[in-house]
């Protein structure tokens, strides 16, 4: 467990930052970035599927990415971290409409809902998304992190909380 965690934090995430810079500066093709990202994604999924822990925590967390968001690596890593710490996990994946998210939240009744927003499409309206989530998911705390939350200057709507760093997210979700 700790080996995967260290590998992602010390090697993979810094490597992905460099890949992002190469992509932004036109030094690699988007297909190359997709290839690397999908190889890492596969490894994270295998790690999630094979994680074994003697710790059992009687709390559940639901992971999702909103419509227009397809960058799963941060969310998959958080899924891995919390599953390895004994939390029950429900992973919906990428591109989930808010109405579908609300349906699953009502069906599964998780203790917390979490999403990490990396790079949504240009059509994504963050404020509209926040309001929809706040209106449709009541009684279950929603935690959001990622670049969009760091640049948002207003107070999030009721029921939604922003976390600014990976460490903040881990500490908060592990203590819920």
Q: For each of these PLM feature ranges, what is it?
A:
Residues 34-141:
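Conserved mid-sequence domains
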Residues 1-52:
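Long amphipathic alpha-helical segments
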Residues 147-176:
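Peripheral docking tails and interdomain loops at the edges
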Residues 143-145:
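Short internal beta-strands
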């Amino acid at each position: 467990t700790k080996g995967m965690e260290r590998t992602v934090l010390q090697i993979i995430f810094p490597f992905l930052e460099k890949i992002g810079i190469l992509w932004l500066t036109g030094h690699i093709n988007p297909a190359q970035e997709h290839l690397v990202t999908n190889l890492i994604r596969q490894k994270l999924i295998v790690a999630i599927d094979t994680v074994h822990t003697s710790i059992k925590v009687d709390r559940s967390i639901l992971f999702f990415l909103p419509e227009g968001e397809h960058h799963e690596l941060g969310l998959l890593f958080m899924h891995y971290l919390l599953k390895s710490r004994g939390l029950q996990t429900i992973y919906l994946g990428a591109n989930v409409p808010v109405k579908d998210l609300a349906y699953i939240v009502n069906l599964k009744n998780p203790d917390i809902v979490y999403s990490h927003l990396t790079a949504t499409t240009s059509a994504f309206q963050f404020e509209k998304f926040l309001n929809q989530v706040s209106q449709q998911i009541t009684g279950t705390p929603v935690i959001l992190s990622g670049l969009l939350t760091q640049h948002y200057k207003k107070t999030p709507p009721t029921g939604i909380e922003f976390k600014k760093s990976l460490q903040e997210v881990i500490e908060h979700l592990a203590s819920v």
